[in-house]
Amino acid sequence: MKLGIVGLPNVGKSTLFNAITNAGVPADNYAFCTIDPNVGVVSVPDERLDWLSQLHKPKKTTPAVIEFVDIAGLVKGASKGEGLGNKFLSNIRTTDAIVHVVRCFEDSNINHVEGSTVPLRDIDIINLELVMSDIEMVERRIDKAQKAMKGGDKKFAHEVEVFTELLEHLNKGKLARTFDVSEEDRALIATSDLLTLKKTIYVANMSENEVNEPESSRHYMAVKTLADSEGSQVIPICAKLEADIAELDDPEEKAMFMEELGVAESGLHKLIKASYTLLGLISFLTAGSDECRAWTIKKGTKAPQAAGKIHTDFERGFIRAEVIAFDDMKACGTMAAAKAKGLVRSEGKEYVMKDGDIVNFLFNV
């Protein structure tokens, strides 16, 4: 999974990126300190994987990972080349979802590119640049389809119709993900890789004083209302606090520090949970003496396709899957005990994978 972190300059974007990835990239108090997109890969914490590793003592343990891309601060006119321009809009296209950091704190010592803290205005500035970029993409798509029609290929008529309606929607400043369309046509639109079609998590970057009671902040509530209206998620985070937590290496010291501050879970954990929920993702596990590993798949994935995540041969030659739920495995203590109780199931090609399944795939090629 790849998440692109966007936002106006000086909203706490790079500070948050540093905190969740421990990458130590510049987070200076001026616009465009992020010259190129910084990339950090973080492990997805999973207590189930930890337990399996303690049981099997494997040669290696491989958690699921999330790739975070810190994309340079966008400004008005980015879609037309202002600031750092189109290059950085193109970096967003390669991501699975967008993490939009919004400044929801007041601090006269930290410059705001627009001069004041108004979260919805800031969101509109970013979204408008994404919309403008999408308009260009859709116009090119329509032009290409119309040329194909003139060449005698009538199957593009419906494509022209759908994208023309979408263009009207975008020209009103609306996001592609709010375009009301059938599932079939939405799948067609998805082939165009539009920025405003991507699912979005808004990160409300708040002060230390407000982050534990976000509902008391009018800035946060404004962002939450917007997120709810478009089916997005919003997470209250204090990037500065996350940076302080990230500097502590000792787990016990970190836990004590978080408890003192009343922080129940880290911003990274919040982001991971929100991204899995928003993108409809689950994890299954494989375990043995060589390796214990967590694999990320979409909800609704069937066993052969899940096997294909490990190796294409597993999917091509799929025979069956030996499956046990993690909770059953943990309750039994060992695989032998689980088999003795009949808790290990044999599942075929139509089996839909569940979160926490421990699986052994049988295949033949």
Regions found by a protein language model. Name each.
Residues 1-111, 139-140, 144-145:
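Conserved G1/Walker A P-loop phosphate-binding module
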Residues 2-6, 17, 144-352, 359-365:
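C-terminal-of-GTPase-core extension/linker across diverse P-loop GTPases
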Residues 14, 31, 67, 105, ...:
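Generic signal for short, ordered secondary-structure residues
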Residues 23-31, 38-40, 48-51, 80, ...:
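Glycine-rich, flexible loop/turn motifs
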Residues 32, 46-49, 62-68, 82-96, ...:
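Amphipathic alpha-helical transducer elements in NTP-driven molecular machines
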Residues 40-45, 72-82, 93-156, 169-182, ...:
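Conserved Switch II/interswitch segment of TRAFAC-class P-loop GTPases
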